[in-house]
Amino acid sequence: MNILIIGHKDHGKDEVGLRLGQLLGCKYLSSSLFMCERAVLPTLAPLYGYATVKDCYDDRDNHRQEWFDLIYAYNRKSPTRTADELLAEASIYVGMRNRIEFDANLDKGNFDVVLWVDASKRKPKEYTCPWNLLRKTQTT
């Protein structure tokens, strides 16, 4: 069974993925960390001086639009590319943000379950970021 966990920034998606993975006995992966090495670090390291994947990942909040654009470019020819690659390594995918990718993955049947993590009673919603999963059209 493949599970997609989505929600706003800092609402606990990774924590849910970790605990669900422990409960079900399966692996979870953060799509941000997964894509950092594949699509983000090679472009942003020379610009911002990142020496490691961790350096780049830890600074992601300061460059959210760039991250979104780089991952979108990585998936442009195949909107299911990231999910196909991540799901080859784990059953729980945490953090999809692109509507085109979301729809393509649902159409392909990549996910059996989609969970929305909502901590809006204690955390702000994400309105000023490249989050377009809730929109009907691609804006990038």
Question: Predicted regions: what is each one?
Answer:
Residues 8:
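P-loop (Walker A) phosphate-binding loop of NTP-binding proteins
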